[in-house]
């Protein structure tokens, strides 16, 4: 790591030009207003679901709503509709909890592979060629239609990034108003000394890029097609 040269002299000179002593410590400001907490404040969970679904239309993301009992059927219908031949899913206990793992083992013509159970390079190779990646959302932001993924060694980022299409399974209980609640949770985990995810990813629909003339190109940096399956788990 490179040494920082002349830092003290620079900061002292800067403080002098500002007409004050150099601060010895940094104190967090006490904000007079915090409007970010007012967005969707007081909405019931079902109302947040409607806000999420409404914004998904803006970000070109298909939405299905189902129950835990009907999740296998709902996911299976999307897989059939999209003509999925190969799919990778994250190594997440919720796939067992929601009864999906047994479905993957008996899905006929579609080849499923779980991330993190074999060689990592083979996982990446499979993900690159896969038609579909499937993960659960850890938090879901209604305002922006964003799924938040707390990734680690068993829940690799490649699952939601490399395949051609992506499906996020969104338990209704994970839906919060906006980014404010997600960053607050991560901050509290850090403050409490808890282990943080190796990587936190925010996914808002399919990959979108635009040039200076605002010509939209989908799929350059990730999946070209995305769907959220909202599961009534409450």
Curated annotation (Swiss-Prot):
Signal peptide: none
Gene3D superfamilies hit by this protein: NagB/RpiA/CoA transferase-like (3.40.50.10420)
InterPro entries: FTHF_cligase-like_sf, LUD_dom, LutC, NagB/RpiA_transferase-like
Origin: domain of life: Bacteria
A GO biological process held by the record: lactate metabolic process
Function noted in UniProt: Is involved in L-lactate degradation and allows cells to grow with lactate as the sole carbon source.
Alphabetical list of PANTHER family matching this protein: LACTATE UTILIZATION PROTEIN C
Family: Belongs to the LutC/YkgG family.
Listed name of the protein: Lactate utilization protein C 1
Gene (name only): lutC1
